[in-house]
Swiss-Prot record:
The gene is miaB. [4Fe-4S] cluster 2 binds at C147, C151, C154. [4Fe-4S] cluster 1 binds at C11, C47, C76. GO terms for molecular function: 4 iron, 4 sulfur cluster binding; metal ion binding; N6-isopentenyladenosine methylthiotransferase activity. This is tRNA-2-methylthio-N(6)-dimethylallyladenosine synthase. The lineage of its organism: Bacteria, Thermotogati, Thermotogota, Thermotogae, Thermotogales.
Length: 430
């Protein structure tokens, strides 16, 4: 039987999709290998949120062609490029909701035939059977597919489709089975995770799902992302406040500090409304760790607009910030109607300014951890040789350890702080 390697680009949802694809391929007898060189077939699970990520997978296709590998494409790149990928030597293209049909595409490719499959088969996935995960203690769990927001810069609604929630019972059954298999942490995923349940019309919601999940004894920590400000219910904040299992990290992308730019982005809230929401969350969850996303250099962004973003970053003091320079994505509203009129040199300068500002904020916030004892779940070994884990506020703490600690709760006393990771010594294994 042919050996298959799956290379995953992009978001955590792609990670989960790759796990699902591996399940279906192994069910049909294919061998999954972590070594691309050993594989007869290489499937790229692609991302096109930014041009850089799209360029990466196209470059990878070129390398694989030289090796005469059978190439398959899944993920958002498959949805965006579709049959155009055949011109690059790709043998099959699988849409984001057609993963259960991937063995059929592989079989056809082995027999020299091309496939482009874009059917919606997500309702056929029996997630409770998919117990094999990339981590032995943590699982990504997609609870809602797609997005209805249509931000003008974003390709996701076109590649992932409209919002579609999974049944709550199905999700809980999956978590219970994963818990029995040794999983201790779960992360609920959605392009707009707060919208979970709204399309089901049966009372399902993210807050209710979190409430049910915390009662599963073996599950020690529950994460969720990514949130959209106008869909974030304070019921979610109350669940976070009332449970020691639900993480205090709330990722709430703002994207910009100027109302003019937010309107142009079709973000559907004002900066005043965003700040009010953050204040409300912090009243309910005083130790909440708020992280966010910001885009610099969006069309028509003036120096005044940029300064409003700077002021926002200074005032909110995000624990973490994902920064991106705007790049037009073909097929989006911004690509079609807005001129990309902020010079690259100015975009780069603005990006660097906020990056340095955020580093200073991180450094100040992290100093509060010095000499404190923190409970973390150990994740893996870093390139530095140190092991690391995260606390309930998503702080990364590195320490001397060994692989027997992976997946375990430990107490670490913080001895050193930086703008990035914290460093400490193990006090106790829990």
């Amino acid at each position: 039987m042919k050996k298959i390697h799956i290379k995953t680009y992009g978001c955590q949802m792609n990670e989960n999709d790759s796990e699902v694809a591996k399940f279906y391929l192994e069910e049909e007898g294919y061998e999954i290998t972590n070594n691309e060189n050993d594989a007869d077939i290489v499937i790229l699970n692609t991302c096109v949120v930014r041009k850089k990520s799209e360029d990466k997978f196209y470059s990878h296709i070129g390398e694989l062609k030289k090796q005469n590998k059978i190439i398959g494409i899944m993920g958002c790149g498959a949805e965006k490029e579709k049959e155009k990928l055949f011109k690059r030597g790709v043998k099959f293209v699988i849409g984001t909701r057609a993963i259960p049909l991937i063995p059929q595409a592989v079989e056809r490719a082995i027999n020299g035939k091309k496939s482009a499959i874009f059917e919606d088969k997500m309702d056929e996935i029996d997630y409770k059977k998919i117990l094999k995960r990339n981590s032995k203690h943590h699982a990504w769990i997609t609870i809602i597919y797609g997005c209805n927001r249509f931000c003008t810069y974003c390709i996701v609604p076109y590649t992932r489709g409209r919002e579609k929630s999974r049944k709550m019972d199905d999700i809980i059954n999956e978590v219970e089975n994963l818990a029995k298999s040794g999983i201790k942490e779960v992360t609920y995923l959605g392009q707009n995770v707060d919208a979970y349940g709204k399309d089901l019309n049966d009372g399902s919601s993210l807050a209710k799902l979190l409430n049910l999940t915390k009662d599963i004894e073996e599950i020690e920590r529950i994460w969720f992302l990514t949130s959209y400000p106008t869909d974030f219910s304070l019921d979610i904040a109350h669940e976070v406040a009332n449970s020691s299992k639900i993480t205090k990290n709330i990722h709430l992308p703002v994207q910009h500090g100027s109302n003019k730019i937010l309107k142009k982005m079709n973000r559907r809230y004002t900066i005043e409304e965003y700040i009010e929401l953050i204040n409300d969350i912090r009243k309910i969850v005083p130790d909440a760790s708020i992280s966010s996303d910001i885009i610099v250099g969006f069309p028509d962004e003036t120096e005044e607009d940029f300064e409003k973003t700077v002021e926002l970053v200074k005032n909110i003091k995000f624990e973490r910030l994902n920064l991106a320079i705007y790049s037009p994505r073909e097929g989006t509203i911004a690509w079609k109607y807005f001129e990309d009129n902020v010079p690259r040199i100015i975009k780069t300068k603005r990006m660097a300014y906020i990056l340095n500002l955020q580093k200073e904020i991180n450094k100040q916030l992290n100093e509060n951890y010095l000499n404190k004892t923190v409970e973390i779940i150990v994740e893996t070994k870093a390139k530095s040789g140190l092991y690391y884990g995260r606390d309930i506020r998503n702080k990364i703490i590195a320490f001397e350890g060994d692989k027997s600690l992976i997946g375990k709760k430990v107490l670490v006393k913080v001895k050193k702080t930086t703008a990035g990771p914290l460093y400490g010594d193990i006090i106790k294994i829990l």
